[in-house]
Amino acid sequence: MLFSGFGSKKPFWDLDENGKRVKKGGYTFVVNRDIPNEKKTVDRLHDAKKVELRLKNTMREELKKGRGGKFKKHMKHFIETQHRFFEMPLKNAGFYGLNKPKNVHKTNKPPIGKDKNLRPSYRVVMLTIRNSNGTVESCTKFLKLLIHELSHTLANHVTWREDDHGKDFKECESFMWKILRKK
């Protein structure tokens, strides 16, 4: 495992979660402190929450209809998983997005993917919202990033692997787009 500098035992991918907490629509989001376009940033994180809820509702409907094929376990897992949305920290080790499983533990739930019975208590999803100029990214670019990061949840990726975007991930990401396009 790679570690950050200065003698820290903290892995390089374990990014800072100490931003400014802002509430909107009954949810709390975390943004960088003293940022331009804070309202737009919070709106974008709120949009992420709405997309997550839409995905979960569509998955529930698909499961009620007996659909889902090989993704039934994945969908149940995704529905049960709580996501907290954060703006990507300015010092981000080169990441554009990051899905951080928190409090990972072994369960008796059906195995899913490479991490089998491991599950997080919740996930922190960090998303780049503004480009280096401080301008909010386009909706299209943001949605692609969001679906990409949420696909790690669907695939049940809970342990760090370098470039964890293999066949299982690609299938999950494709399935997420299919679910999003329903309705």
Protein language model annotation of sequence segments:
Residues 149:
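Walker B catalytic acidic pair
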